[in-house]
């Protein structure tokens, strides 16, 4: 009986020693893989939104495409992570005919935000505002902010449907900067 007990104990110890070595090696590999960090700037996912609206008897088709742009200056957040800034392209057609194609970057909004408030921020994106658009003027909302936080100064962008320069104003109703941004 004592012989069987000792043999069983020896086999169990051998099994633990053999399995324990592999587990330790696998655990080390898994820990190493989990600790490795990505190199280079981070980028937002590309975003493509399509809108269809009937305004003043005309059918408008609007495409808004956001892409991370490595040609724009990269920004760093409070933790030192680096991010590519985004470029947003808006294409609009009226009754099947191209109206305009415009590209926006964070610099288009620089006149409306103090440099200190836009530090570490990217152009988060833009969206079509159908409720406040008309056949004469298409209205969009835009926002800049820190990557991943999605808070920051908001803007109203109006583009004349007949062509011409767009207008940009700070949207204090949608602004998520808090009281500091309202001064």
Label the model's feature ranges.
Residues 55-57, 94-96, 132-139, 162-163:
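Short, solvent-exposed coil/turn segments at beta-strand boundaries
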Residues 86-92, 155-162:
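Beta-propeller blade signature
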Residues 99-102, 151-155, 166-167:
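Short beta-strand segments
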Residues 114-154, 160:
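Acidic, glycine-rich flexible loop segments
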